[in-house]
Amino acid sequence: MSIAFGGSIDDGRGHITGFLEHVDTDPILQGAYDGGACALSGGDARCGGSSTIPPGRWYDFGYKNAGYTPIDTSVSDYKFDYKLLGDEFIDRAGQLYNYNPTNHYQRPQDKINAGFFSKYSITDKSEVYADVRYTKNQSPSQIAYSGTFGDLRSVPCYNANFSEQIYNAVCGNWTGMGGSHAPNFATGAEALAYISSLNGQVADGSIIGYSAPMRSLKRNVEGGPRTYTQSYTNITASVGMRGDINDDWRYDISYQTSQVDYSQEIQNDLSVTKLLRATNVINVAGVPTCVSKLNGTDANCIPYNLFSGGLPGDGGIQAIWDANPEIQTYMAIPNFILGDSSETIFQAYVEGTTNFSIPGAPSAVSMVAGYESRELESDYRPDASAQAADRTGAGGPIVALAGGYDVKEFFLELGIPVTDNINLEAGARFADYSTDND
């Protein structure tokens, strides 16, 4: 929707034009079209995608390098590539996750533009002018569900949620690996003492370690797709005065100020810190309990059970479905990024025709001379977890930035006619920059 209006004032000495525009764009998902619903694959007659899959992919992440060897000496290939089905690990068999359907072809948008332009003649040779422009925009984007994305790289062998089959596959069948299958302790103190004893065995060389070095690629389909809602508001205003000095010279003096406020909200990505805590789980009185809750690191920790109830296809894991919504509230960390920038510009110049000319030239030299000052400041403020890259889908830390500069400039431009067909142009500019760090 767009509206524009305007008219003259004071018997034509002034004029005002205003406008208002509202843009409301509906989202279009890739899954709505045959050509976009399927991630491209290298020639296979199926959808491609990511190996971060709903039942969870687990693969070897350093058994051999750490010094672990299979108890069965006939096993020469240390590598494995599992997924969860029921309470057991089975071969992944190349399963991929088609991430296309939840992604946007077209993002939704809610945008308002408004403003006005005006001028008013003070005298026959001078006028004042002003304009204001306002924009408010919000656009949420959506991409595929979050996941562990390899940020979980080991799981303690005492994990309370391991079935016997899983325990044997990743712990019990390996020489040098410590930790019993799902031990149960009467108190938290006993559980912590047990972990301390395992650390002692590592220290004295009795065992190499007690955490299975396997990497997790689990798609969190039990939660919601990741969303990134970007919003900004901008207001720019300027005032000025311009007119004729005489028949040959004109002037223009103006001042402009602009302010932009920015925000971004990121939802449904998993916290790396909470992922590590929620998978370090031990039995206390028959209840799977986070070690971080026992040692006082995180009293709110909820176990993230990646090992019970793997469903076929893209169904996810039943244990996580059963723990919703509490587990998603704990695991899915929101991030907030705020920012703002401001700019002010002052400019004054004169332009006209001089009394100088090249002999034989068809007209005199024209000139523009002026001064401009600009001040700009910007501040980009990610929250602490964003700066620490505490999101499994982050790809790295988001760096905070802040700073500004100001500049003062003098400029001169000349238009020099030589003949009817030849003109020379010349210009000079002096600029003095200063930053906030000076």
Describe the role of every protein-language-model region.
Residues 1, 423-433:
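Transmembrane beta-strand segments that form the barrel wall of outer-membrane beta-barrel proteins
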Residues 1-24, 113-121, 129-133, 240, ...:
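Predominantly transmembrane beta-strands of Gram-negative outer membrane beta-barrel pores used
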Residues 6-7, 20, 407, 425-427:
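Membrane-embedded alpha-helical bundles of multi-pass transporters/translocases
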Residues 7-9, 118-120, 239, 243, ...:
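Residue-level signature of outer-membrane beta-barrel architecture
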Residues 26-28, 32-41, 53, 73-109, ...:
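Surface-exposed, low-complexity loop segments enriched in small/polar and acidic residues
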